[in-house]
Regions:
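Substrate-binding pocket helix/loop in short-chain dehydrogenase/reductase
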Residues: 115-116, 120-126, 208, 219-220
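Conserved glycine-rich cofactor-binding loop
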Residues: 16, 23-25
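Residue(s) in the substrate-gating loop at a strand-loop-helix junction
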Residues: 157
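A conserved structural motif in NAD(P)-dependent oxidoreductases
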Residues: 224-235
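Alpha-helical segment proximal to the catalytic Tyr-Lys
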Residues: 144, 186-190, 248
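Active-site helix of classical SDR
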Residues: 139, 173
């Protein structure tokens, strides 16, 4: 009975998870939740300004009674080399022959508020290099080390299926993420690996602060569940479930985490 209770309490025991862009916001919440469920977690970040936040998150995780391990990997995932830099840093910890990754959460992203007349090619590259190419390159870097019955969870957005004024680049990039999710599911499912996406509605974060207030207020007013914003904990719990054994028959799906604002 004790073993069964332990497995239920820590469904991700000894799994290695990578959570990109996890120094703050939803990413940090996901890293914490996966660790709380037993996973060892690699936290990726890009800016030196995020180091203190990463250290605080790692210290918080280290206080969990089951003592999950954490690693911090600094890399710019908008570049063509960033994803491989994350893997190289993990290989330095584990050794090339011993690295086995069980969970990848593609979360790192950026947005830009500009009407189409003002968008430049540089703007396009800034958003798509991280939000789309970055996810693809991270997948390519991880797959050689991905364990059977692996879990890939991509962070999308309700914006992938709704047109919002001034954020066309962000919305289009998230639509691409959803298409990636379905295609990768068809490619990787043979060994029990699942690939899913979570599409949050508005959640308090640095990123949300850049979205026009009228868009956020409209979403709150039209959200059936309590007419409020979501929380990082609510999004992280969905990701935690998708990463675990109970979600083994769910794949190729986009889960709208928006309190009913967007219904798929």
């Amino acid at each position: 009975m004790g073993d069964l209770e332990s497995q239920f309490a820590l469904p991700l025991q000894s799994k290695l998870a990578i959570v990109t862009g996890s120094s703050r916001g939803i990413g940090a919440g996901i890293a914490w939740e996966l660790a709380r469920r037993g996973a060892n977690v690699c936290i990726t970040y890009v800016s030196d300004n995020s180091k203190l936040l990463v250290e605080e998150l790692m210290a918080k995780i280290s206080q969990l009674p089951h003592k999950p391990m954490t690693w911090a990997c600094q890399a710019d995932l908008s570049t063509t080399t960033g994803a491989q830099e994350v893997i190289s840093q993990l290989k330095a910890y584990f050794g090339s022959d011993d690295l086995q990754i069980h969970i990848l959460v593609n979360n790192a992203a950026t947005e830009m508020v500009k009407n189409i007349q003002s968008v430049t090619l540089e703007d396009y590259n800034k958003v798509f290099n991280l939000n789309v190419r970055g996810y693809m390159l991270m997948m390519q870097a991880v797959v050689p080390y991905l364990a059977s019955k692996g879990r890939i969870i991509n962070l999308s957005s309700v914006g992938a299926r709704v047109g919002f004024e001034g954020v066309s680049l962000y919305c289009a990039s998230k639509a691409a993420v959803e298409s990636f999710t379905r295609s990768w599911d068809s490619e990787l499912g043979g060994d029990g690996t699942t690939v899913n996406a979570v599409a949050p509605g508005p959640v308090p974060s640095d990123m949300l602060d850049k979205i026009p207030k009228e868009i956020v207020d409209m979403q709150k007013a039209r959200t059936p569940v309590e007419h409020r914003l979501g929380t990082t904990e609510e999004i992280a719990s969905i990701v935690g479930w998708l990463a675990g054994p109970d979600a083994s028959w769910v794949s190729g799906q986009v889960i709208s985490a928006s309190g009913g604002w967007s219904m798929y």
